[in-house]
A protein has these predicted regions:
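Acidic/histidine-rich, metal-coordinating catalytic segments
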Residues: 55-63
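Sequence/fold signature of self-assembling virion shell proteins
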Residues: 1-46, 52-53, 65-166
């Protein structure tokens, strides 16, 4: 998955090893530690220095409250007109960019990803094709088949903070 492509800008726990795409080596877990705002700033700077402009921060549910607790220069708002209190952070603005925070249930609970979506591209491996199947009564049946892959144009434009605990 995507975690295996983010090989350059990784912040890892002790004994953690980043993936190596060329050698087909998967990431190795390191010692768990607590996510801090300083870690986010560090990986954001690394991405920016490599020419990336990440705009999305993918966060697993277990770490969402930790991100919402980042203080930075934050101000919490209380909208009295509609009796709404905003107790979460939807956008994080840092020294190296503005990041939309995306809750993600499709990643490990110990990883956070800072992604530059402009550096990924959907490629077609096999074009969409309809193949007729056996006719059943008055209905005609088809199999629609296609094959895609996701291309990482520059893995250094994105980054990962790994080996995290809630």
């Amino acid at each position: 998955g995507g975690a295996g492509w983010l090989a350059t800008n990784n912040i890892l726990g002790a004994t953690g090893v980043a993936p190596n795409v060329a050698a087909n080596t998967a990431p190795t877990d390191g010692t768990l530690r607590t996510l801090t705002e300083a870690m986010l700033k560090d990986v954001a700077q690394k991405c920016w220095e490599q020419g990336g402009d990440p705009t999305m921060l993918f966060v697993p549910g277990a770490l969402r409250a930790t991100v919402s607790a980042f203080t930075g220069a934050a101000t919490k708002f209380d909208k009295t007109e509609d009796k709404t209190i905003y107790a979460t952070v939807e956008v994080y603005v840092g020294d190296f960019g503005r990041y939309s925070i995306v809750n993600s249930r499709h990643q490990r609970a110990r990883d956070v990803f800072l992604v530059d979506p402009g550096q990924f591209e959907l490629l077609t491996l096999r074009a969409m094709k309809a193949t007729p199947l056996a006719k059943t009564g008055d209905s005609e049946n088809y199999m629609i088949n296609t094959e895609w892959t996701l291309k990482s144009k520059q893995d250094a434009a994105s980054g990962a903070i790994r080996d995290l605990q809630p």
